[in-house]
Each structure stands twice: as structure tokens, then as C-alpha cells.
Regions:
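Alpha-helical transmembrane segments of integral membrane proteins
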Residues: 251, 259-280, 287
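"…together with the soluble PPM/PP2C metallo-phosphatase catalytic core" -> "…together
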Residues: 1-232
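Single conserved hydrophobic/aromatic residue that forms the stacking wall/gate
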Residues: 314-323
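Extracellular/periplasmic helix-loop-helix junctions in multi-pass membrane proteins
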Residues: 283-297
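Cytosolic, membrane-interface loops and tails of multi-pass inner-membrane proteins
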Residues: 17-42, 235-266
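Small-residue-rich transmembrane alpha-helices that serve as helix-helix interface/gating elements
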Residues: 294-307
């Protein structure tokens, strides 16, 4: 316990040091017509997630060196992109290379079925970017990530899948970030930036990857279902509208709630957090531990969330028509 208190204090100090550097170097996020915020805010505060894993390694040992190397690579490139925009090709090469490092750490690069590895790499990088796209309002990245990692810590209570200290240290980093970001619109001290959203996505996917490989059950991805439904259905919606997927937009469900329906950032972030917590805890404690039950639970929640998303779109369109 004392160790975790020390880690928490060190992370708070590290965040303040970063704020000083970001302020001096003018690492800021300026609002535009597609933003869900209206004030200039420090960018890149999510670097604390990378720092948190390094601090964890310093205290508990570097048990997953390839994972840490991959995280450092993808977060580092993302941080540079936060400061000076990089070509998509550079970011994708870094993301696929980092994902391959994580896969090497997971021990799956030697699998004979190369097409499964290739598909898994595409899913890993795709999911990383979907999580990144979901970082658009105060509190949503940290709050949702807590809703993923807390149930994961409960599943891993005896360290059955991965070092529990890594999960707890990451949770501490998220709590530190929440202090400065889980605030009403216009009140956040910092934003996560790509370094934060990409970094925490990489961490969560690696942790879930350990559980999936150990259990042989891919339905554990339900821990990311709320983000997955919003992110994927938004992409489908934009394709149907013939929009350029590379351009910024405000069509995610959370953006519709925050911008069109004028629901507060903290309320929307809390809603996403609570929904994912309820789904994950139900999966752990209410769903029978069988493959069939897991798939039925996943399918049911997927359908319910998809219908909810579609209804929200119609609600938003109706509101626009009234205006």
C-alpha cells in the first residue's frame, strides 16, 4: 500500500512538471468548429499514462519489456504528433510496429496461422484508433478507462493473467489525470492528447490480450463494448453519408449528447463510464462462465447498445429539424 501511495504522489508531481513544460513550450489545444470545447487548454496531459507504466517498472520490475518498448514508441510518436502534425503513414507504421512488439510480448508471433496474427494486428491498431477517436470531451478517456480497468483488476485479483501491480499503477495514473480533466466544459486543466488516448488504448488492449489468450475467449472484448459500438457505428454512419473519414467531425454519440443535446461533459463521460461498468460487472458476476453464455450476453448487449445509438441519432435529427 505504501508503494502505491508513493507512486500516486510521484505521478502528481510528474503531471505538474509536465504542465510547466507544456506551458513554456506552448503545447496547447486550440478549439475549432469541430471541437467540443471552447477554451485553450494544455495538451498532452495523458503522457502520465506512459510515465505511470515506467514508474511501475521502476518499483516492481520490468516484467514486460517488449510491451513497454511498444508503448514508449507509439506514445512517443503520438506526442510528437500532438506538437507537430505527422503524416498518417508515419503514425500507422509506428502503431503496427508497437502492436507487433506487444504481440511478441504476448507470445503469439510464433503462431503458424499467420493470417490470424495479421488480422489480430489490424484489429489491435484499429481498436487503438477507435479509442483515440472517442477522446473528445472532458473526462471521457480517463473515466471510461477506469470502467475498463477496475473490472479487469477484479478478474485478475489473484494475478492469474498479468501482474496486478501494473493494472493498479495504471489506475493510479488515470486518477491523477482525472484530477485535472474530469471537470465541466471549460474547466479542464489539460487534455489527454494523442499521447494519452493512444497510450491508454495500447495499455488496455495489451491487458485484455493477456486475458483473451489465457482463457481462449475473445468475448472479453466486451470490456470495450460501449466505445466499440459508438466508434464503429459512427464510422458506418459517416460512410453512408459519403463523408471523408479522415476529416474531423462531431457525429459520435457522446458528441451529439454534448453538443447538440447540450448535456454536460461530466454527465456524458459518467454515463459512458457507468454503462461500461454495468456491462462488464454483469459479464463477470451474472453471466454463467460458459462460452455459449458469454456469446449470448455479448450479442444481447451489442444489439441493445446499437439500437440505443440509432435512437439517439433520430433524436438528434428531430432536434435539428425543430431548430
Amino acid at each position: 500500500m505504501i508503494t502505491y501511495i508513493i507512486i500516486f504522489i510521484l505521478l502528481i508531481i510528474a503531471e505538474f512538471v509536465y504542465f510547466h513544460i507544456a506551458d513554456k513550450c506552448n503545447i496547447i489545444d486550440k478549439p475549432n468548429e469541430r471541437s467540443s470545447h471552447s477554451t485553450i487548454v494544455l495538451r498532452g496531459g495523458g503522457i502520465i499514462f506512459l510515465i505511470g507504466v515506467w514508474v511501475w517498472g521502476a518499483f516492481f520490475g520490468f516484467h514486460y519489456p517488449w510491451f513497454l518498448a511498444g508503448l514508449t514508441l507509439v506514445a512517443g510518436v503520438s506526442f510528437v504528433d500532438d506538437i507537430h502534425s505527422l503524416p498518417d503513414s508515419v503514425r500507422l507504421v509506428a502503431q503496427f510496429t508497437a502492436a507487433a512488439m506487444a504481440f511478441y510480448q504476448l507470445g503469439i508471433l510464433h503462431w503458424s496461422m499467420w493470417w490470424i496474427i495479421l488480422l489480430a494486428l489490424i484489429v489491435y491498431v484499429g481498436a487503438t484508433n477507435v479509442i483515440n477517436f472517442m477522446d473528445g470531451i472532458n473526462g471521457i478517456t480517463a473515466g471510461y478507462s477506469l470502467a475498463v480497468l477496475i473490472p479487469l483488476a477484479l478478474v485478475n485479483i489473484n494475478g492469474a493473467f498479468i501482474k496486478q501491480s501494473l493494472i493498479i499503477s495504471t489506475i493510479l495514473a488515470l486518477l491523477v489525470f482525472c484530477i485535472f480533466n474530469f471537470r465541466p466544459r471549460g474547466k479542464a486543466k489539460c487534455f489527454a492528447g494523442d499521447v494519452g488516448s493512444i497510450g491508454i488504448a495500447f495499455i488496455m488492449l495489451f491487458l485484455l490480450g493477456n486475458v483473451i489468450i489465457e482463457t481462449g475467449d475473445i468475448t472479453w472484448l466486451i470490456f470495450l463494448l460501449v466505445y466499440g459500438v459508438d466508434g464503429c457505428l459512427t464510422i458506418v454512419h459517416r460512410i453512408m453519408l459519403h463523408e471523408d473519414l479522415g476529416e474531423a467531425h462531431r457525429k459520435h454519440a457522446y458528441q451529439i449528447m454534448a453538443n447538440e443535446l447540450k448535456i454536460g461533459h461530466v454527465k456524458v463521460a459518467s454515463l459512458y463510464m457507468v454503462m461500461q461498468l454495468l456491462i462488464s460487472l454483469g459479464f463477470i458476476y451474472l453471466c454463467p462462465n460458459t462460452v455459449l453464455a458469454h456469446w449470448l450476453y455479448l450479442a444481447t448487449t451489442l444489439v441493445v447498445l446499437s439500437i440505443t445509438y440509432i435512437c439517439l441519432l433520430y433524436t438528434s435529427d428531430a432536434a435539428d429539424d425543430r431548430i
